[in-house]
Amino acid sequence: MDLKESPSEGSLQPSSIQIFANTSTLHGIRHIFVYGPLTIRRVLWAVAFVGSLGLLLVESSERVSYYFSYQHVTKVDEVVAQSLVFPAVTLCNLNGFRFSRLTTNDLYHAGELLALLDVNLQIPDPHLADPSVLEALRQKANFKHYKPKQFSMLEFLHRVGHDLKDMMLYCKFKGQECGHQDFTTVFTKYGKCYMFNSGEDGKPLLTTVKGGTGNGLEIMLDIQQDEYLPIWGETEETTFEAGVKVQIHSQSEPPFIQELGFGVAPGFQTFVATQEQRLTYLPPPWGECRSSEMGLDFFPVYSITACRIDCETRYIVENCNCRMVHMPGDAPFCTPEQHKECAEPALGLLAEKDSNYCLCRTPCNLTRYNKELSMVKIPSKTSAKYLEKKFNKSEKYISENILVLDIFFEALNYETIEQKKAYEVAALLGDIGGQMGLFIGASILTILELFDYIYELIKEKLLDLLGKEEDEGSHDENVSTCDTMPNHSETISHTVNVPLQTTLGTLEEIAC
């Protein structure tokens, strides 16, 4: 029996695509690539498959586009804590300089900066001053035969700024006595200020285990309005208010009290209920935050306020070759002349182009404190006489100078506000996988089947191509070498013995 296939029988053999279609797990293609002629059924299956594939591509492209839009969602949660670290509290008297501490040398160097004297070192508007204050100022501003001495802005602010030891009438933390020694001196744009629970100098951070009044910081202050500088003009440093400015902030964040602080007025007891918020932001491309671990030139931990102060410091040093007292670094302090002529105008110019020069992004991890303020009038009619006797001050003085500040946690919990990626890679793969299963019944393994088929197809084509090239090369060598050898042997005499003929055959094999 002849096993060789006839041409008609060979044409009925399935092609490789038909074999793949009938063995693949991809739905629908086995009905398209069937044995036999083209039918309407095959066409309908092809249309259905192509349509499903098109819908899959549309839905998948929409999901991919949504993923690369880098959307985020915000999760808010309340967490109950066993204890909470009490925040840092920075407070500044709105009057930065005590009038009684000014000397003739101070007025000679800084009188114009303080707006007490004009450019000629004269009192500009004496009719606006209180007679007693005017007389004291005239005595201090008498520069006849005066020889000026050296002047230091740092020493000046230390000496002339309000002393917390004199301002503080009492202090309690969680019902326990505290004092001025529990505060750290810091410098801000308001001059000499004080920070409670700074954690500096190796002091442990104070904690609280209860919420509500009586479980935080309570202080009574005398703002000493009698020491306020007289005002007869307006400058950048002029303040018309009386009281203290307070900022509640994290210990890792420097105070920026001139913009982030709130005011506390004399004659009132102010209650500040606060709640800690822990915020987590996403870095680019999902958000715009910057890692808190990426320090700055003058601060080890990044924060918005640290970035602002760092930027202002670099700008002033670059333009004025000095720095203000509240600015970090090792550049020399600005003189009063540099303050008025360069530093203050430079800060004003910087504020105008702040968005272009000082780009301070939100840190990825941030702790802030929400505040709810309420206040009551002090003293009451029944307590006025007692306070007059206790502090040896009149009722009018108490209402104009004394204030009480009570800061406490509203409850022993904190709020977390966290940005999360709205759409991650796992969700993208899940959606695309679901669409693949819905429209074409495919999976990852089906994709691997396609790649495997393409690989085998390419390998077969390459092997066929290489086989043809080898066959052609072998045929050429047989014609050129092996055909010439017999011709060469014909020239040999017939008397050649058999061993020689055997040797010749071996050489022919090697040559071929």
Swiss-Prot record:
Its main location: membrane. One of its GO terms (cellular component) is neuronal cell body. It is a multi-pass membrane protein. Expressed in brain, cerebellum, trigeminal sensory ganglia and also detected in testis. Residues 65-424 are extracellular. It is found in: Cell membrane. The chain crosses the membrane at residues 43-64, 425-439. GO terms for molecular function: ligand-gated sodium channel activity; monoatomic ion-gated channel activity; pH-gated sodium channel activity; voltage-gated sodium channel activity. Glycans are attached at N365, N392. InterPro entries: ENaC (IPR001873), ENaC_chordates (IPR004724), ENaC_CS (IPR020903). It comes from the Eukaryota. A motif (GAS motif) lies at residues 441-443. Keywords: Cell membrane, Disulfide bond, Glycoprotein, Ion channel, Ion transport, Membrane, Phosphoprotein, Sodium, Sodium channel, Sodium transport, Transmembrane, Transmembrane helix, Transport. It catalyses: Na(+)(in) = Na(+)(out); K(+)(in) = K(+)(out); Li(+)(in) = Li(+)(out). One of its GO terms (biological process) is regulation of vasoconstriction. The modification Phosphoserine is found at S8, S11. Disulfide bonds join C92-C193, C289-C364, C307-C360, C311-C358, C320-C342, C322-C334. Gene3D superfamilies: acid-sensing ion channel 1 domain, Acid-sensing ion channel domain, YojJ-like. Forms pH-gated trimeric sodium channels that act as postsynaptic excitatory sensors in the nervous system. Upon extracellular acidification, these channels generate rapid, transient inward currents that fully desensitize. Highly selective for sodium, they are permeable to other cations. By forming heterotrimeric channels with ASIC1, could contribute to synaptic plasticity, learning, and memory. Additionally, as acid sensors at nerve terminals, plays a role in mechanosensation and phototransduction. Belongs to the amiloride-sensitive sodium channel (TC 1.A.6) family. ASIC2 subfamily. NCBIfam families: ENaC. Can form homotrimers. Heterotrimer; forms functional heterotrimers producing channel with different properties. Forms heterotrimers with ASIC1; while ASIC1 determines current amplitude, ASIC2 influences the properties of the current. Forms heterotrimers with ASIC3; resulting in channels with distinct properties. Interacts with STOM; STOM regulates the gating of ASIC2-containing channels. Interacts with PICK1; promotes ASIC3 phosphorylation by PKC and activation of ASIC2/ASIC3 heterotrimers. This is Acid-sensing ion channel 2. It comes from Homo sapiens (Human). The gene is ASIC2.
